[in-house]
């Protein structure tokens, strides 16, 4: 637990399930105020709210499309209305998109992933930074990227491109705001055993995926959440512009061991 996080206010986008849910729940354990965001899963958001409150935090949920400015504004307005400020912005919402060879991909399929993953992250960061700058808040922006900011993902060019974009966005924002006391970092998860990750469900795909991971195990959402709590705490006060890989060594090119 990080005592400096007690009473701080965070927005966590896409927090009705998976990694976002785990981060929001961990923030509850840190006794933080959390704005839970969902787009199409109100029951999941309700569950997240309940767990945050059980953990000792305070929470409210908002339905919003993070790829739209009005969606991000609704999140910020809710944070200010209920908790009076914003200290931490976690841009977690992400969309894998369809798998297709690039020459066969529609512009619509490309654009949807870019809109959510890149534009949504930018809009979330922009709103948070604007609030922090106006109010002299030495806050944190945390972007959830992926190992695919470094490892190309076959037949999913839009996803790899979006995560590579998040990497450079994180570093550029960190450079721009470091002297203002605002830290901007990213987490790049590997294969995490969430309810929607099919690679961790079926035995054939499980074994295929495990061969890519030196630790021979899938990550847990709670392990990503632990990294998130550390990065936005004062324990990481000298860390900015960094991507923390939570991947069991997946980016270490395990094929070199063969």
From Swiss-Prot:
* InterPro entries, sorted: NAD(P)-bd_dom_sf (IPR036291), Sc_DH/Rdtase_CS (IPR020904), SDR (IPR050259), SDR_fam (IPR002347)
What EC numbers are recorded for this enzyme?
A: 1.1.1.47
A GO MF annotation of the entry reads:
oxidoreductase activity, acting on the CH-OH group of donors, NAD or NADP as acceptor
Q: Does the keyword Cell cycle apply?
A: no
Query: What is the enzyme's main class?
Result: oxidoreductase
Q: Which UniProt keywords apply?
A: NADP, Oxidoreductase, Stress response
Name the protein family.
Belongs to the short-chain dehydrogenases/reductases (SDR) family.
Q: What is this protein called?
A: Glucose 1-dehydrogenase 2
Recorded source organism is Bacillus subtilis (strain 168)
